[in-house]
């Protein structure tokens, strides 16, 4: 199991520079705010950091803050077992992805292969991760209205 520790980001969606969120202060975190305040952007940023895609299908060109338009940066720190991992993304015209384990660079030669390594470390696919990490009313309703077979399949996939 992984534990998300810290998320830092600059210029993603409606956010500017210098955002820092400690994710392991509590076992469950609820983000509350009015519409348009950036609540749903946080899990999307986490998905981008770990899987290079997001559950809303937002294109890469639409992720940078449109008022700054200077690319974006994401750093996500997480642990698995006794190891501390850090994923750093710097995207302007191209993407630079760096993966560290306990301070040592274990990135592959390409961003695609580095993301494959990240998924191997996490041990769950994108869909399962998104359903576990990001609960909104639609996602909760999907599980509740799913057939018994599909609910069972989802729960078995967690094991």
What are these regions (language model features)?
Residues 1-106:
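Extreme N-terminal "head/tail" segments of very large remodeling/mechanoenzyme assemblies
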Residues 26-29, 37, 82-159:
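Extended, charged alpha-helical "arm/stalk" segments used for dimerization and assembly
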């Amino acid at each position: 199991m992984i534990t998300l520790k810290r998320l830092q980001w600059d210029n993603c969606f409606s956010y500017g520079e210098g955002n820092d969120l400690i994710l392991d202060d509590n076992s469950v975190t609820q983000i509350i705010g009015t519409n348009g305040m950036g609540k749903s952007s946080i899990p999307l940023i986490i998905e981008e950091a770990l899987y290079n895609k997001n559950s809303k299908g937002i294109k890469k060109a639409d992720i940078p803050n449109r008022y700054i338009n200077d690319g974006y940066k994401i750093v996500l720190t997480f642990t698995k077992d006794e190891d501390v991992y850090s994923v750093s993304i710097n995207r302007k015209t191209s993407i630079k992805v760096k993966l560290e384990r306990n301070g040592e660079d274990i990135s592959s030669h390409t961003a695609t292969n580095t993301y494959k390594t990240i998924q191997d470390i996490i041990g769950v696919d994108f869909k399962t991760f998104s359903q576990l990490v990001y609960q909104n009313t639609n996602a909760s309703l999907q599980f509740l209205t799913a057939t018994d077979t599909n609910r069972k399949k989802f729960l078995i996939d967690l094991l």
